[in-house]
A protein has these predicted regions:
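Flexible loop/turn segments at secondary-structure boundaries
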Residues: 60-61, 87-89
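Short acidic/histidine-rich active-site segments
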Residues: 80-87
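Alpha/beta enzyme core
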Residues: 1-53, 60-78, 101, 107-111, ...
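C-terminal helical cap(s) of enzyme catalytic domains, especially alpha/beta-barrels
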Residues: 73-76, 88-127, 133-137
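Short strand-loop junctions, especially beta-strand C-caps/beta-turns
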Residues: 55-58, 85
Length: 139
């Protein structure tokens, strides 16, 4: 089954699915990260004018999340749907502000990450692992 999941996440398959959403009349499409900004730009093109938002997927480190969002926005994405990366964050307010800076104010991921480190310094940018920050045991 792992191979089937990987096949569905392949850039060509994701692009085809975005195009299908556009052809079926979607008002907006939430899509997975295809690997880099150029591939995301091809998704924007495939969407034929339908706005794209970046899905969060697995819990990411802060720097990686902000970097993906910077690349997606530069490629024509309009926002993100990254709930897990916000509500599991040690400072949901700070990561939301950092994402807003990148998306709405066109800050670089590095600049937003620096501000995030100042606002929520403990472990800023560390890769995910263990229990969600700020929780004791299972949620």
């Amino acid at each position: 089954m792992h191979d089937a999941v990987e096949l569905l996440r392949a850039p060509l398959a994701v692009r085809r699915n975005v195009r299908l959403c556009a052809e079926l009349g979607a008002d907006i499409v939430k899509t997975n990260w295809p690997g880099d900004g150029d591939a995301f730009a091809r998704l924007v093109e495939a969407a034929a004018g339908i706005p794209l938002v970046l899905a969060g997927g697995s819990r990411l480190g802060d720097r990686e999340l902000l970097g993906r969002m910077e690349a997606a926005t530069a490629a024509g994405g309009i926002g993100c749907s990254v709930g897990r990366n916000i509500f599991m964050h040690r400072s949901p307010e700070a990561i939301t502000r950092a994402l807003s800076r990148v998306i709405r104010e066109r800050w670089s991921a590095d600049k937003a990450f620096t501000e995030l480190q100042e606002a929520a310094p403990e472990g800023a940018g560390e890769p995910p692992g263990g229990a969600p920050v700020g929780r004791e045991g299972p949620a």
